[in-house]
Design a protein with these regions (language model features):
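Extended, folded cores of ATP/NTP-driven motor/assembly subunits in large transport
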Residues: 1-324
């Protein structure tokens, strides 16, 4: 295994303790008003970013966007981890009516306002438009204290924001209340408009921030979990296919369901990545040599190398060139 990946997994490993309450299930240990969270020995910071028009872009623009995305990933610091999250959540009708609809003003234009509001409500009640999508990028790093973590985030957050802006994606940092609101909506589906949190007031009264976001109950079964009366399930991709369409993520997140899709990224130094690919290529060549030796021992001197071995050999050589 790659050394950096092995060290990261080792640092993330924690001793499991049986939770005594629903609050104990939430892994966050401490929060700060600026949005820095501590979980275990790691600190994290989250950015919210807007979507880009990739699906309708031309082939040249898609290539440019893909290369810009690659530059963003390559700019991430080794030793840190990054999580890209796409959050599909149900649109809260009461909140929509309060924030989006135009209130009547008692003049001659109220008829137009009423008609416009009816059109918006008709759009929202349609099942295909009842789910809104938000996107986040979360940076996490192991540091000795929050001051060192803030120094790291000051640099990396600015770099990530500038690269996202270069892709025409608006980006904003999220404070503690914003991040807790996301967790509240996840843990308390159907109660999105009931989120109330004042960090200063909580500290004054000695209340835990977890009380504001945790569900009433949480149960974990063999293949699903029950959270506040709602049933859920976690799926993960154990292995990737050799070819993945660029529309795969869009197809997964276009489901009309409340879901969170996360992509975890662990940056690896170039020299370690090249060494790993060279070892894999050496393994492929060894398999080919052993196969040919077996064929020769059977007096089969004209045998063609199996297609899967030849394909592995062809894919490994260009991969080393792209990494280096």
């Amino acid at each position: 295994m790659i050394k950096t990946l092995q060290n990261t997994l080792k640092q993330d490993k924690e001793i499991f303790t049986v939770p005594r309450s629903v609050q104990d299930i939430i892994p966050i240990r401490r929060i700060w008003p600026d949005g820095v969270f501590q979980f275990g020995s790691k600190y994290s910071k989250t950015l919210r970013f807007s979507d880009i028009n990739y699906a309708i872009a031309s082939k040249e623009d898609k290539t440019a966007m893909f290369l810009s995305y690659s530059e963003l990933l390559n700019a991430l610091d080794t030793g840190s981890t990054t999580k890209i999250t796409i959050n599909n959540k149900r649109l809260d009708r009461r909140n929509f009516e309060q924030e989006i609809l135009i209130p009547p003003k008692g003049d001659d234009l109220d008829g137009g306002r009423k008609e416009y509001n009816a059109m918006l409500l008709d759009k929202v009640t349609d099942s295909s438009n009842s789910v809104v999508q938000e996107r986040y990028i979360t940076l996490s790093v192991h540091k000795k204290n929050v001051e060192e973590a803030r120094a790291f985030f000051d640099r990396t957050v600015h770099d990530a924001s500038s690269r996202l802006n270069h892709m025409d994606s608006h980006c904003e940092e999220m404070d503690a209340a914003d991040r807790l609101h996301i967790l509240h909506d996840f843990y308390r589906v159907g109660e999105e408009s009931e989120f109330r949190f004042d960090l200063r007031e909580n500290m004054k009264n000695g209340h835990s921030f977890k009380d504001a976001i945790c569900p009433d109950s949480m149960e974990f079964k063999k293949d699903h979990f029950i959270m506040g009366g709602k049933y859920g399930r976690v799926l993960f991709l154990k292995e990737y296919a050799s070819y993945i369409k660029d529309s795969m993520i869009n197809e997964l997140t276009s489901l009309n369901r409340s879901l969170m899709l996360s992509i975890d990224i662990i940056p690896v130094p170039t020299d370690e990545a090249v060494r790993e690919m060279q070892n894999r290529l050496l393994g492929v060549e060894t398999n080919v040599t052993n196969w040919q030796r077996r064929q020769n021992s059977n007096n089969n001197f004209s045998a063609v190398v199996p297609y899967d071995m030849e394909l592995q050999r062809k894919e490994s050589n260009p991969a080393i060139g792209r990494i280096g």
